[in-house]
Curated annotation (Swiss-Prot):
Swiss-Prot/TrEMBL cofactor(s): Mg(2+)
Organism, as annotated: Clostridium botulinum (strain Alaska E43 / Type E3)
Protein EC: 2.7.1.50
Annotated residues for binding of ATP: R124, T175
Role this protein plays: Catalyzes the phosphorylation of the hydroxyl group of 4-methyl-5-beta-hydroxyethylthiazole (THZ).
GO terms for biological process, alphabetical: thiamine biosynthetic process; thiamine diphosphate biosynthetic process
Pathways involved: Cofactor biosynthesis; thiamine diphosphate biosynthesis; 4-methyl-5-(2-phosphoethyl)-thiazole from 5-(2-hydroxyethyl)-4-methylthiazole: step 1/1
Official protein name in the record: Hydroxyethylthiazole kinase
Claim: Kinase is one of the keywords in the record: yes
Family named by the database record: Belongs to the Thz kinase family.
Lineage: Bacteria, Bacillati, Bacillota, Clostridia, Eubacteriales
Amino acid sequence: MINEILDKVGRLLEEVRTKKPLVHSITNYITATDCANVILAVGGSPTMADYVKEVEEIASISSAVVLNMGVISEKMVEAMILAGKSANKNNVPVIFDPVGAGVANFRNKSAEKILSEVKVDIIRGNISEIKFICGLRSETKGVDASERDMNMGNDKKVIVAQELAKKLNCVVAITGVDDIISDGKRNVILSNGHKMLANVTGTGCMSSALCGAFAGASDDYFIAAICAVLTMSISGEIAYEKSKGIGMGTFHISLIDAISMMNENVIKEKARVTTINR
């Protein structure tokens, strides 16, 4: 099964460059540039429109829509719901990044409102965010996962991901030291990445943007999520080797470089994937 997954991931890396999916990303001003750049780096075409009077139209012609709660407001929630509903109506996949879910009442209610009105196809977040969405007690530390949640065993994280995937009929990606991805039936643990990724603002948001790019070129959103997370985590390893002893700025640039150069051979050489039957 692992070889089959990696074959599909490798093909998708090529297909996204051929199809050049238009990815409508309603995201936050902190990470918007990096999100746009990683979409471009893998071959997609980003649009970052968030004005309520145009989001429905843009979503309707897009290949994927990414809704990111990094900086939230009533107008942003309205725009996300309008874009999400338009995407649903036009069979466009929706990726939801519930940044900071669990940390504050308005943010929590916003996440709940979006999910009550929009059918999402991929949810990507850290373990604390995903636990909150799943209705479990979480201990979010700002927009970061709490240490207690991060120290949950992978077996428990797989259960959380799988149950939420079944509940919402979507793919769930929990990113962290190890990454858990489930569509409710298929479950994988991805064990790539480097701790330096946590020191760059927005690598989670970038991972969600990559989910949009790959989902926009595939109808298998489980594979799209795996492709996105492996691309980010393996690129983190490569970027660390290139920037070792230099500093964070070089790591950041090297990360984008590595994402832009990702291909099937690199994935098959470096990916560490474990399938979980449950």
